[in-house]
């Protein structure tokens, strides 16, 4: 009787349209209930029974109910699931398998089975890649997933690496393929094998892609020749090896090992500028005046070189600082080091006055045992030999940026536009409260940005610098020449690491076209997007493996009185994040560890400060002593507290 009643249908429709709804993202808690976060200000309570229909991170539409003046959300429609493809640990055995996603806020096991075509017999503790197949808000009874890939077994010492690479869908090994012979590129190569080229790298480096040679001219100016490994002499554009490199975009450097962009035969041997081996190279010759200015007369050319020495950063630095026992093999090598040192000092001086120089931060190196155990974490400060190479590379990349811009009008450029224009007024207002007066328009120019950076560098602490970081834009990869505000340069195009960066290989091909006087097409925009995405994934992978290894390394310090110096890097409502100075580990200090009485404590992300009873006790960039309260291995998080 009521089945096809149009009045009833209309009434239903009316009720549906009058019921308040909200769209937002589900936030789970450890207590079973959750919240629907609509925006920064508004959220609705989701009761535990309703949370069974959704997962943390799902974007949903929910019906809003009001009972006794209390609002709650009932999930109704799934807009975008949080989980699609994920990694996790398998539970159970035989026919009843489930998988717990490897995520700090997802604790529930999801029933699953091996997907068709997956041969592995899954058992308790295995790590796997899974894909969601069912969701309660899609009309299914429950969540369900397919296991699409076996990663490794529970006790594999190398779980951090294999799981992280699988999570980000990154390659686990070097690409297959061999390059049998050099291509005929129609390039005349200058024979520079008699010159005393040297490489300076870490002692363990095998993929050497830059060699340096300096000489003093009669007028006292210095001439620098930068010779770069030449993989495009072996790899034809559009070939199988080229396409594999294009997808990888970069060599992926993880703690303990790397996954190269090119086959190891090329990256570590045929292309690597090994000592006493003749190698093809792409070279740039520049003349540097006493004040560090690079003359306009820049020459790019193809060459053949033979490195005369594989030098290590620490040895060269010790020798220049008159420390240690290491000596160059002969006077020719010693002379090169002295000249390169002079170039470094004059270029560094030029950049201080005319561009920008990054503050030196140490690199942290994990020392690993054969089973992936962390034996030590060593802070490696950037020493004078590192700076020699850095100044030479920046100079060479600046030369390439100019030549590509002037001769072609395009290339693969690293572009950074400083501050987002939308933030200029807020930035000027913030600086004013700290006694720095800047013009909101001027600070958006390269000159204005450099001027401000120099003023910030002259401040007694880095606190103000840390406050304005959020107003900065991100660096991008572009085919269009543009300024790099972060370096303080009008244009910057890298070509000095073609063994490990696909963008540098592209710039090699463009520079070779310039050398030959040939026309060449502008690189496709989708290549820059692929490179940006891969750079993001590689950085996340490096961070994830690092978090895992830091947790392993500091696990036995939890609950002890061992003190660590730690720099405060961020303040949030819930507490502060710190970086341990000696090893680089990131730890979290919950607000209750800062002060027991919550009402007397104000943690302000906006101001980067922690106030107790109205007084600023901690601020970002302060260095404090902490102890490790707890290490949570399942989430790889380190909880610290201020040392008593």
Swiss-Prot record:
S1 motif domain mapped to chain residues: 561-643
Record-annotated membrane-spanning stretches: none
Magnesium among keywords: no
Subcellular location(s) per record: Cytoplasm
Domain RNB, first and last residues per copy: 189-516
Record flagged with keyword Hydrolase: yes
Protein name, as recorded: Exoribonuclease 2
Lineage: Bacteria, Pseudomonadati, Pseudomonadota, Gammaproteobacteria, Enterobacterales
């Amino acid at each position: 009787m009521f089945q096809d009643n149009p009045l009833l249908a209309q009434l239903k429709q009316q009720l549906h349209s009058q019921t308040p709804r909200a769209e937002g993202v589900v936030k789970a808690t450890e207590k079973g209930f959750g919240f629907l976060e609509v925006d920064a200000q508004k959220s609705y309570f989701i009761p535990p029974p309703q949370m069974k229909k959704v997962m943390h991170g799902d974007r949903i539409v929910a019906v809003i109910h009001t009972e006794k003046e209390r609002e709650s959300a009932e999930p109704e429609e799934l807009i975008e699931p949080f989980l699609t493809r994920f990694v996790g640990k398998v539970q159970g055995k035989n026919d009843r398998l489930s998988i717990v996603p490897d995520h700090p806020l997802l604790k529930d096991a999801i029933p699953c089975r091996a997907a068709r075509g997956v041969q592995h017999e899954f058992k308790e503790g295995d790590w796997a890649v899974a894909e969601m197949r069912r969701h309660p808000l899609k009309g299914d009874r429950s969540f369900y997933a397919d296991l699409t890939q076996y990663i490794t077994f529970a006790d594999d010492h190398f779980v951090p690496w294999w799981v992280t690479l699988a999570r980000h869908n990154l390659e686990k090994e070097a690409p297959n393929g061999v390059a049998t012979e050099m291509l005929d590129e129609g390039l005349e190569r200058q024979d520079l094998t008699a010159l005393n080229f040297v490489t300076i790298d870490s002692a363990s480096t095998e993929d050497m892609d830059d060699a340096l040679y300096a000489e003093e001219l009669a007028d006292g100016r210095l001439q620098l020749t930068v010779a770069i490994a030449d993989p495009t002499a072996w790899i034809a554009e559009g070939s199988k090896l080229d396409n594999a490199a294009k997808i990888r975009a970069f060599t992926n450097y993880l703690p303990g090992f790397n996954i190269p962009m090119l086959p190891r035969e090329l990256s570590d041997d045929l292309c690597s500028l090994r000592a006493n081996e003749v190698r093809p190279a792409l070279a740039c010759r520049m003349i540097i005046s006493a004040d560090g200015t690079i003359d306009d007369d820049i020459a790019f050319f193809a060459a053949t070189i033979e490195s005369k020495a594989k030098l290590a950063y620490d040895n060269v630095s010790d020798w220049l600082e008159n420390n240690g026992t290491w000596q160059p093999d002969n006077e020719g090598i010693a002379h090169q080091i002295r000249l390169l040192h002079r170039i470094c000092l004059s270029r560094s001086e030029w950049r201080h006055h005319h561009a920008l120089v990054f503050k030196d931060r140490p690199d942290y190196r994990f020392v690993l045992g054969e089973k992936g155990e962390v034996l030590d974490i060593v802070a490696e400060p950037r020493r004078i030999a590192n700076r020699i190479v850095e100044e030479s590379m920046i100079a060479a990349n600046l030369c390439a940026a100019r030549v590509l811009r002037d001769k072609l009008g395009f290339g693969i450029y690293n572009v950074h536009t400083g501050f987002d224009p939308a933030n200029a007024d807020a930035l000027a207002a913030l600086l004013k409260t700290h006694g720095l007066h800047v013009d909101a328009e001027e600070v958006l120019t390269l000159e204005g940005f450099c001027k401000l950076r120099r003023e910030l560098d002259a401040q007694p602490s880095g606190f103000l610098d840390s406050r304005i970081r959020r107003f900065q834009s991100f660096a991008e990869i572009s085919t269009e020449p543009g300024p790099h505000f972060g370096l303080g340069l009008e244009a910057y195009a890298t070509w000095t690491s073609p063994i490990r960066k696909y963008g540098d290989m592209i710039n090699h091909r463009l520079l070779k076209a310039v050398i030959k006087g040939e026309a060449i097409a502008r690189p496709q925009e989708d290549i820059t997007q692929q490179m940006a995405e891969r750079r993001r994934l590689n950085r996340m992978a490096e961070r994830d493996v690092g978090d895992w290894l830091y947790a392993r390394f500091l696990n036995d310090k939890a609950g002890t009185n061992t003190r660590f110096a730690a720099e405060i890097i961020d303040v949030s409502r819930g507490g502060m994040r710190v970086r341990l100075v000696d090893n680089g580990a990131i730890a979290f200090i919950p607000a209750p560890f800062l002060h027991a009485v919550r009402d007397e404590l104000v943690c302000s992300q906006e101001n980067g400060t922690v106030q107790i009873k109205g007084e600023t006790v901690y601020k970002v960039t302060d260095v404090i002593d902490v102890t490790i309260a707890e290490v949570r291995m399942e989430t790889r998080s380190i909880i610290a507290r201020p040392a008593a």
